[in-house]
Regions:
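Carbohydrate-associated surface elements
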Residues: 114
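Active-site core segments that coordinate phosphate-bearing ligands/cofactors
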Residues: 2-10, 16-18, 118, 125-140, ...
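Short linear loop/turn motifs
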Residues: 226-235, 342-346
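N-terminal glycine/serine-rich phosphate-binding loop of ATP-dependent small-molecule kinases
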Residues: 1-107, 135, 228, 233, ...
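Short secondary-structure junction motifs
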Residues: 24, 80-83, 224, 351, ...
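A structural motif corresponding to the C-terminal end of an alpha-helix
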Residues: 218-225
């Protein structure tokens, strides 16, 4: 069969998802039922040039993407003719700038965790404060977002500003870099992004889904550098002629947390998912109108399918969840293995009065208090290591409840009736912890539901790509494929639930105002 022949539709059995993450790049092959056929994965180097700086090598990442695509095809023993389409999901906010004529990055990827842009953010905020652009872009000024990272590169890499103004440089988040290279690079590569990734740059109008030239000018970013913004599900381009995926449509792009929401079939207003990893990321679907948060949450795009209206979400991020369990293991030695925490915590009936607020680098949503630091409170001689383990488990559930209550308040204030939570879909490594999941249901007061396919992020990108080419007919197929693995119903007495949460809130208050601005940590 020649490379340009059209294969019969029944020959197209799979969709390929490329998951370009913070620590590794993965390729996952899915079948029509949403089941995993094969996976390949390759880690990349974490580069720390200075305290607070985190970088990746963009060329290394592209090499790894090519490697895992080849690896997954070999493992599944298939060729590109059996692949209907390709979806991309990615670590959000990480930014790269490259020369469109040579394909070479002018600097390393500046990763979402990197904090070097704080002075740029302070300068942009001026007297208006960190919410200067929030009405327009849905985000407060913060070092997470991609726009100021590009500003830093243009201001600090020799010759970059001049090359950008001459029209020689392009910028993008990691979806854009991957897409541009997959579709040909310097030989006609497609320079585009989707609405979810664009919504994390601080450069996109959240209402109109286009670039804001005033904010670009404030940040000193020529509009010529920016990718075209497109729907999440739609054909972006086709695999390059000299690659493994020649002529295969690349037809879905979603930022990682939005992809997880899509993979969890959160298509109705008021549906929410929480991903339990190093931290927690919760997204609640708020429908086709953006809801502005008055309660410390971000307004973001959830997804857009073709010409349909974009669907929005409120997002709350929790800095420390699974990493607290690692800290208990590595720093205190209370457990030997992360999975041991559940049995230790279950060996006592309650927390013994102990509460652990893991504000190791401040508190994220909904508090946004960088001055907070971690605290273990309520200690008596009665408390033992099992009570501390239980307090660690419970802290993730309390923090999740704080974010959910903020979401419900925002939804109610916006008049967005029907957007109050009815069940919480969960994914990520910590969802294997039965004690935590039951306590989570007890605290949020609604059922907590775990799906059978744990790889919800890659699955979401695959669905977006497959829908665009008719491999799946639409979101109803995603809903039909989604299968429940386990459900935890709230079982705690209301008075006890509220007593515990009241004490948690008291514990949070004890962590605030800890860092003085004039004290160097």
């Amino acid at each position: 069969m020649s490379p340009n022949s059209t294969a019969d539709s029944d020959e197209k059995k799979y969709v390929l998802a490329i998951d370009q993450g913070t620590t590794s790049s993965r390729a996952i092959l899915f079948n029509h039922d949403g089941g995993i056929v094969a996976v390949d994965q390759k880690e990349h180097e974490q580069i720390f040039p200075r305290a607070g700086w985190v970088e990746h090598n963009a060329n290394e990442i592209w090499d790894n993407v090519r490697s895992v695509v080849g690896g997954v095809l070999a493992k599944a023993q298939i060729n590109r003719h059996e692949i209907a389409s390709v979806g991309i999901t990615n670590q959000r906010e990480s930014a790269v700038v490259w020369d469109k004529n040579t394909g070479e990055p002018v600097y390393n990827v500046i990763v979402w965790q990197d904090t070097r842009t704080q002075k740029i953010c302070d300068r942009l905020a001026g007297d208006d404060g960190p919410n200067k652009y929030k009405d327009r872009v849905g985000l407060g000024l913060a070092t997470y977002f991609a726009g100021p990272k590009v500003t830093w590169i243009l201001e600090n890499v020799e010759g970059a500003r001049e090359r950008a103004e001459a029209g020689d440089l392009l910028m993008g988040t990691m979806d854009t870099w991957t897409l541009w290279n997959l579709t040909g690079g310097v030989n006609g590569g497609v320079h585009a992004t989707d609405v979810t990734n664009a919504s994390r740059t601080m450069l996109m109008n959240i209402d109109t889904l286009d670039w804001n030239p005033e904010i670009c000018a404030d940040m000193g970013i020529p509009v010529s550098m920016l990718p075209e913004i497109r729907p999440s599900s739609g054909v972006f381009g086709y695999g390059r002629k000299n690659g493994l995926l020649v002529d295969t449509p690349i037809s879905g792009i979603l930022g990682d947390q939005q992809a997880a929401s899509f993979g969890q079939a959160c298509f109705e207003k008021g549906q929410a998912k929480n991903t339990y990893g190093t931290g927690c990321f919760m997204l609640m679907n708020t429908g086709t109108t953006p809801v502005r948060s008055e309660n410390g949450l971000l307004t973001t795009v959830c997804y857009q399918i073709g010409d349909e209206p974009a669907v929005y979400a409120l997002e709350g991020s929790i800095a420390v969840a699974g990493s607290l369990v690692q800290w208990l293991r590595d720093n205190l030695g209370i457990i030997a293995d992360s999975k041991d925490i559940e049995a230790l915590a279950a060996s006592v009936e309650d927390n013994g009065g102990a509460y652990f607020v893991p504000a190791f680098s401040g508190l994220f949503a909904p508090h946004w208090r960088p001055d907070a630091r971690g605290a273990l409170v309520g200690l008596t001689r009665y408390v033992n290591k099992a009570h501390i383990a239980r307090a660690v488990e419970e802290s993730t559930a309390y923090q999740t409840r704080e974010v959910l209550e903020a979401m419900n308040r925002d939804a109610a204030a916006s008049g967005s009736t029907g957007a109050a939570l009815t069940e919480l879909k969960v994914d990520g490594g910590m969802t294997r912890d039965e004690l935590l999941m039951q306590f989570q249901a007890d605290q949020v007061g609604v059922p907590v539901v775990r799906p059978k396919v744990a790889e919800t992020t890659a699955l979401g990108a695959a669905y977006a790509a497959g829908i665009a080419v008719g491999f799946w007919s639409g979101t109803q197929d995603v809903i039909d494929n989604w299968a429940e693995d386990k459900r935890w119903e709230p079982a705690m007495d209301e008075a006890e639930r509220e007593r515990l949460f009241r004490n948690w809130n008291k514990a949070v208050q004890r962590t605030l105002d800890w860092v003085d601005e004039d004290v160097v940590e």
